[in-house]
């Protein structure tokens, strides 16, 4: 094994690497000059057959040659990879100065935003969000809530009846589109052991014509609390907290006696007009469109849960008491943002939703 032969093998490998114009050609040269059948690999195997005194010198010579070959291979591979990457950047370059068609961002509907905001107030107080079916059994929608069989709300002119089992129709079907979210409360009392603290947002249906102040499909949010020792004071404090969180710490509320089948005693809750703060009452120089110069805005109905409702839903009225409250989201949104026509909320016109922001 002559030194000049080893040098020739090394030089041929270096020349082949330098001549490779791309990574594929370099791979072929690599196999030819560093693979198992390459000249340097064969020379390395022949070292074992040399006399002992010649092995060290031959091994050193072959090792130096193979080291130079591997170093040159790595350097050439790095060069070719850099050239490839630069070429790809040029070929796949994107001209960021070109104009493009802007896709407008969407906006959450203000009804959704406000309903979630109200629900968050109660969730922060420890209430749980509860949901139920919109196509509801008449028992949950009326009977469980102490609506008598002859109550006007159960008539077809006020309620959407759905075709029931075996083709029964009208008020004989026993199935309705829920007229309020109160059936969720009845289901919750039947499914859970007290204490129960829930808030129930959702869509409800009534046979109203779509006009500036009515819609047959609207949204309600109700809450229910069932526990030992609850009183009207707890209800008043809870609702005061909601109003002050949503409208400001200086907001005042009042309760007016009323009647609802599912609560006893019952009341309508009003809050001080957040626009005029009551200063428009008896003051023709400062009329207020929001409260019609009455100084108060009606929020919704509330009261202590009727013992008959507790009994129907499996709760012992001798041990537990509860309170409930509910109001319509659309009406409250009309007050908050001076929306004059409720149809704007349901027609899907982005010109209505966009100004409310909340882009996603």
UniProtKB/Swiss-Prot annotation:
GO MF annotation, one: ATP binding
Per its UniProt record, what InterPro entries does this chain match? aa-tRNA-synth_II (IPR006195), aa-tRNA-synth_II/BPL/LPL (IPR045864), Phe-tRNA-synth_IIc_asu (IPR004529), Phe-tRNA_ligase_II_N (IPR004188), Phe_tRNA_ligase_alpha1_bac (IPR022911), Phenylalanyl-tRNA_Synthase (IPR002319), tRNA-bd_arm (IPR010978)
EC number per UniProt: 6.1.1.20
Cite the PROSITE patterns for this sequence.
AA_TRNA_LIGASE_II
What is the predominant subcellular site recorded for this chain?
cytoplasm
Q: What does the UniProt entry say about where the protein is found?
A: Cytoplasm
| Cofactor(s) this protein cannot do without | Mg(2+)
Q: How is the cofactor bound?
A: Binds 2 magnesium ions per tetramer.
Which reaction is recorded as catalysed by this protein? tRNA(Phe) + L-phenylalanine + ATP = L-phenylalanyl-tRNA(Phe) + AMP + diphosphate + H(+)
Q: Which UniProt keywords apply?
A: Aminoacyl-tRNA synthetase, ATP-binding, Cytoplasm, Ligase, Magnesium, Metal-binding, Nucleotide-binding, Protein biosynthesis
* Gene3D superfamilies registered for this protein in UniProt: Bira Bifunctional Protein, Domain 2
Q: Which GO terms describe its biological process?
A: phenylalanyl-tRNA aminoacylation
* UniProt cross-references to CDD domains, sorted A to Z: PheRS_alpha_core
Positions of Mg(2+) binding:
264
Q: Which GO terms describe its cellular component?
A: cytoplasm
Q: Specify the domain of life of the species encoding this protein.
A: Bacteria
* Subunit structure of this chain's protein: Tetramer of two alpha and two beta subunits.
Q: Which family does it belong to?
A: Belongs to the class-II aminoacyl-tRNA synthetase family. Phe-tRNA synthetase alpha subunit type 1 subfamily.
Q: What is this protein called?
A: Phenylalanine--tRNA ligase alpha subunit
